[in-house]
């Protein structure tokens, strides 16, 4: 299960946004069809290993993206990284989607598709192997990715949980 983290202030980071998906939604009403747009956005600061996601809905695409950026800034989390990769293999789940993250050696790059790639690059991960299993719905894939990222623990966390020094591991 994901750990509860303290709120991070978006103003203290240099966040870059990346639009993952834009979906046109039509609501059929008595007088015709009402068109609107839904945007899924990921923001992150690669140098600080901070990333967040959010969605926005509006009648126009730019307003939907703006709302998605505002929503994602309220949803930031810090990620434990080992140099440029994830510290260990982890499996994140949400709905019928699963995302597997595996550490990779230097020079591998981000081997990921679509929504997972957007999250990894925004978080500052430079070398990682990923596999998306199950659904390819970007909302569920991103939530599964964030579940996996929340499970990451570095050596200091493991040592503290075991009541040992980092050198003893």
Give, region by region, the residue ranges found by the protein language model.
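Ribosome-associated RNA-binding proteins
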Residues: 1-169
